[in-house]
């Protein structure tokens, strides 16, 4: 990866002074654009690097957004000494993964109004409760959603994690956790000057399953009925086998 990095870095530096670069103002690349998830997947660390037509005091913000969809927040209560889920709220159009990185504090780069308009920040995401669900204290549910996603490492804010060099080069490491969802991930690089957007570029990362986990996933998606029947039969066989072993062990104890 180091060899590829240096080759791409030389390429980026070579176009830094070209007319093409002057028009685009920012170019970026990833050390890995395809991530394969196998049964022993422990996460991935991807290097993002690039060049920009910068000046002293410029800033770079990197936003990585995974597939969006429905995310459920559940409330647990203790009933008769047992914790059970008593209520739930579904949020739609919610990023299943979100990482926001910057070269310094985001509040020092953009004011609150600009952050809200640009959806930069976990509290500025334009997600909403699924229609038809009545929610009391929605603010608390939204806080619980954020707390859950942060705890599971699916959302993160990484300030001071983008390294700038000579107002022309930048790099940052993107970390995907072991529980990351599959799909297309958008990598948006934003170049700011005096709190105003100067240029941007969008790259992408494809996360997919491989090996036996991919086969199981494909069967579950394409043959859901068959997969359900197989899961039930497997559970019955496991239960029957466990019961048989228990009987033999118990009989041996009695004989002894």
Question: Model features per residue range: what roles?
Answer:
Residues 175, 196-229:
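Short, aromatic-rich amphipathic segments at membrane interfaces
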Residues 1-8:
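Bacterial N-terminal signal peptides that target proteins for export
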Residues 235-256:
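Juxtamembrane interface at the cytosolic side of transmembrane helices
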Residues 78, 82-177, 181:
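Membrane-proximal low-complexity regions enriched in glycine and acidic/polar residues
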